[in-house]
Amino acid sequence: MDSRRSLLVLALLFISFLVYEQWQMDYNTPKPVATEQAQAVSSNAEMPASTSSTEGTVDNVAQGKIISIQNDVFTLKVDTLGGDVVESSLTNYAAELNSDARFILLQNKPNEVYVAQSGLIGKNGIDTKAGRAAYQVEAEQFTLADGQNELRVPLTLEKDGVIYRKVFVIKAGSYDIEVNYEIQNQTNEAIEVQPYGQLKHTLVQSSGSMAMPTYTGGAYSSADTNYKKYSFDEMKDKNLSIDTKAGWVAVLQHYFVSAWIPNQDADNQLYTSTANGLGFIGYRGPVVNVPAGGSETIKSALWTGPKLQNEMGAVANHLDLTVDYGWAWFIAKPLFWLLNVIQSIVSNWGLAIIGVTIVVKGILYPLTKAQYTSMAKMRMLQPKLQEMRERFGDDRQRMSQEMMKLYKEEKVNPLGGCLPLLIQMPIFIALYWTFMEAVELRHAPFFGWIQDLSAQDPYYILPILMGASMFLLQKMSPTPVADPMQQKIMNFMPLIFMVFFLWFPAGLVLYWLVSNIITIVQQQLIYRGLEKKGLHSRKK
């Protein structure tokens, strides 16, 4: 019994430490690297090299202007010099709780750069190290009208007898943006261009601990790897270069992600690079030959918005994996599905968390019952076990043999009280990641003072209630710990957990509180059954 309690204490403390570390890191935004070289403007070093042996030329040094493209979920700012998306404001997401300001994902500030770039390079490319394509537009503001499903925004450039159109296609209610090139070759010679798309981001310093470091950085998917992170530190150490069918590249930022998705039927090259205090992760598509007098359309897509699993999964294979549940994904995914289903019924994420807790505890009830039954049987054997310790003294081998014989005769599994607890730990970790990764919980209210389930309880009421419920649950335990040191540790456990949970998301604390309350109820039901079997007697 003592060894099992020690294992439980150590396991709970270890899990609490890991979760606490991750919470601290997720809510400590990495600071940009201090450098005078980081600029919001394009530089020669930022342009990807073409796989073609020659490169086009640009005769102008024009300045672009910023145009606005808007639907019901975002507003994009696009620079006509190159056609880069230099800002994305998300209509349905506040910058902070109760703020009228919208969350800005892509942005182009001198010390905070996060831009989605794309262009045409190669032999006849219009985006080169000498300069970017200077597009013309019909207006400076484009808005998808109510009732309209789709809006096309063309940026046009005519150069050397070739008409280039960079067309942004936005849809109602979608963060998926088509970015297509329509090329009309009106000359008597064939031309060659190569499309690229890249995400430019200020290099950020790593923070956090070795246990579970924080992460804001790149990620990619290829034919051989469904999903893999590629951090800014890795970019600085080694440039990524992968040839793949289909694939995509992305930059992750907690609840949000931007991703370039090239033509999924083409052979693409994924790459990273660094220059001037900036990190780049992007793709190069295959070289496209446009015959004399002919035309070609080159397709790609840009996602810039929240991590919405279903929607992202429909845009590109494995893009939904950017909702990163870690190793517990196989548990977290069905838990999130259940959470979403319950929320659709009760229309409150706090009530949905309570519903999920009830379902999870209900499913685990047989394990809980087996745990308490095993512990009760072990308590009944304590007098015999103590007698063995006194009889065999230092002869540990003989004592172990006799103990195993006793367990077999009494049909008791000495690990029966521990194994169910170990099974429940991955579920708790999966729930933590579900609550931490679900953008749906960001700024989601419960009731009263809980207006953001993804943030800590501002008045610490839930953690205090959780600590009280844990203290009550401990006091209802039928057997005190024999070892004085272990008893002191167990007495402090509710306080330790309460302190840890002061800074945890309110949603996670709510889960633990409700779980404790349900455990108290289940415990009483189980004890009644054990009393009838003579395996338990109530404390006086």
Swiss-Prot record:
Name of the protein in question: Membrane protein insertase YidC
Cited InterPro entries: Membr_insert_YidC, Membr_insert_YidC_N, YidC/ALB3/OXA1/COX18, YidC/Oxa/ALB_C, YidC_ALB_C, YidC_periplasmic_sf
Broad class of where this protein is predominantly found: membrane
Entry's localization field: Cell inner membrane
Family: Belongs to the OXA1/ALB3/YidC family. Type 1 subfamily.
GO molecular function, one term: membrane insertase activity
Function of the protein: Required for the insertion and/or proper folding and/or complex formation of integral membrane proteins into the membrane. Involved in integration of membrane proteins that insert both dependently and independently of the Sec translocase complex, as well as at least some lipoproteins. Aids folding of multispanning membrane proteins.
Matches recorded under PANTHER family: CYTOCHROME C OXIDASE ASSEMBLY PROTEIN COX18, MITOCHONDRIAL, OXA1
GO annotation, cellular component aspect: plasma membrane
Keyword Cell inner membrane: yes
Description of how the protein assembles with itself and partners: Interacts with the Sec translocase complex via SecD. Specifically interacts with transmembrane segments of nascent integral membrane proteins during membrane integration.
Membrane topology, from the record: Multi-pass membrane protein
Residues annotated as transmembrane: 7-27, 345-365, 415-435, 453-473, 494-514
